[in-house]
C-alpha cells in the first residue's frame, strides 16, 4: 500500500513495569493520537490506564501464543519465527489495523511491551504501509521493575532481571539505525517538562501547553510510583552484563552516548550474544548459571552479615 504522505508512527518500547504507560500518555502532549480503543484500566496496577490499543495488544498476544511463548518467557524469538508469523494471516490483520489508524491520523502512538520482542514482524508491516516509525525506549531501574513484578506477579527478582535483559536488548537490537530515543522513567517523573522538551526537540514536535500542564500536574502522580531502585547497582544487578547495559542506557537517556556509534553497536552486539546464545537451551542454561551465581553471592553475603552481629 502506497501513501502520498509519509505517516509518522510513534512506538513505545521497553520492559513491562518500566513506565511505558506514562511515556505513552505523554505523547498526547505533542498532539499524537492514541486512539480510543484501549485495554481496560486495572486499579492497583495501572490506575491511570495502560494506553494500549486493544486490537494490537490482542494480536501480539495471539502471535506469541502461536509461537508457544508467553510474555514472561525468556525464550528467544528467532528470525524463522518472524518469517512464520509474516506468512500467516497475522500479517494481513496487522496491516489492516495500522492502515485504519494511520488513515485517520497523521501522527499515531502505540504501546505494548511485547512490541519490543515482536518488532521485526511489525517493521515488515511498517514498510508495506510506507509508515515512518519513531521509537521511544522506556528505561527504568531494573530493581524497580523487579520490585513491581514481585508485587504484581510474585516473580523472583532473578526472573524479573532476566526478563528486563531480554526485553531491553530486543528493543535495542531491533531499533538500530532507526529514529529512536531513550527516555528515563525516573527523570520523567522528576522533571517531566524537561524530558518532554527533550523529546520534542529530538523530533521537532511542538508542545501543546494545555496538554503539558494536564500531564505534568494532573496525570503524573508520585504516589503511584511505588517502587524505586535505590540499592547500589552492583548489589542486585549481577546477572550477566545487566549493570553495564543499564549504565550505558542511562547515559543515552541524557544524550551522552550515541547508541548507533560503531563502537557502541559492537559492545551491544557482544552483550546480546551473551544473553541470547544461538540455541534456546543454551540461552536458558546461561540465564540459570547467572541466576545461580546471584543466589550463591547473596547466601554468602547473608552469612557474613549474620556473623558480624
Regions found by a protein language model. Name each.
Residues 20, 49, 53, 60, ...:
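A structural signal for well-ordered alpha-helical scaffolds and beta->alpha junctions
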Residues 90-209:
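PAPS-dependent sulfotransferase catalytic domain
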Residues 1-5, 172, 201-309:
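PAPS-dependent sulfotransferases, especially Golgi type II membrane carbohydrate sulfotransferases
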Residues 1-91, 220, 285:
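PAPS-dependent sulfotransferase catalytic core
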Residues 6-16, 21-30, 34, 109, ...:
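Structured catalytic/translocation cores of nucleotide/phosphate-coupled proteins
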Residues 39-40, 138, 210-213:
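Proline- and acidic/polar-enriched loop/turn elements at helix boundaries
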Residues 58-63, 154-163, 230-237:
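A polyampholytic, Gly/Pro-enriched intrinsically disordered region
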Residues 42, 141, 190, 214-215:
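Positions that flank functional sites
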Amino acid at each position: 500500500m502506497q501513501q502520498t504522505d509519509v505517516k509518522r508512527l510513534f512506538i513505545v518500547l521497553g520492559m513491562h513495569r518500566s513506565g511505558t504507560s506514562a511515556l505513552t500518555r505523554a505523547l498526547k502532549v505533542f498532539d499524537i493520537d492514541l486512539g480510543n480503543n484501549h485495554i481496560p484500566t486495572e486499579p492497583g496496577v495501572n490506575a491511570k490506564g495502560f494506553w494500549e490499543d486493544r486490537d494490537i495488544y490482542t494480536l501480539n498476544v495471539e502471535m506469541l501464543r502461536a509461537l508457544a511463548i508467553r510474555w514472561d518467557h525468556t525464550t528467544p524469538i528467532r528470525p524463522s519465527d518472524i518469517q512464520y508469523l509474516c506468512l500467516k494471516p497475522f500479517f494481513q490483520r496487522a496491516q489492516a489495523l495500522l492502515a485504519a489508524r494511520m488513515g485517520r491520523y497523521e501522527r499515531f502512538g502505540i504501546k505494548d511491551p511485547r512490541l519490543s520482542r515482536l518488532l521485526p514482524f511489525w517493521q515488515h508491516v511498517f514498510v508495506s504501509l510506507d509508515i515512518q516509525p519513531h521509537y521511544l525506549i522506556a528505561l527504568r531501574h531494573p530493581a524497580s521493575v523487579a520490585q513491581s513484578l514481585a508485587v504484581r506477579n510474585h516473580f523472583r527478582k532473578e526472573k524479573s532481571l532476566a526478563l528486563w535483559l531480554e526485553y531491553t536488548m530486543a528493543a535495542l537490537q531491533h531499533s538500530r539505525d532507526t529514529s529512536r530515543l531513550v527516555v528515563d522513567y525516573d527523570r520523567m517523573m522528576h522533571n517531566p517538562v524537561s524530558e518532554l522538551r527533550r523529546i520534542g526537540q529530538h523530533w521537532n514536535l511542538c508542545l501543546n501547553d494545555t496538554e503539558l500542564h494536564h500531564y505534568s500536574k494532573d496525570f503524573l502522580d508520585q504516589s503511584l510510583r511505588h517502587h524505586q531502585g535505590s540499592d547500589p547497582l552492583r548489589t542486585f544487578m549481577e546477572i550477566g552484563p545487566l549493570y553495564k547495559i543499564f549504565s550505558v542506557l542511562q547515559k543515552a537517556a541524557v544524550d551522552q552516548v550515541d547508541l548507533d556509534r560503531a563502537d557502541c553497536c559492537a559492545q551491544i552486539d557482544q552483550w546480546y550474544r551473551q544473553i541470547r546464545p544461538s540455541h534456546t537451551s543454551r540461552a536458558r542454561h546461561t540465564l540459570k548459571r547467572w541466576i545461580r551465581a546471584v543466589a550463591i553471592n547473596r547466601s554468602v553475603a547473608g552469612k557474613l552479615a549474620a556473623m558480624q552481629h
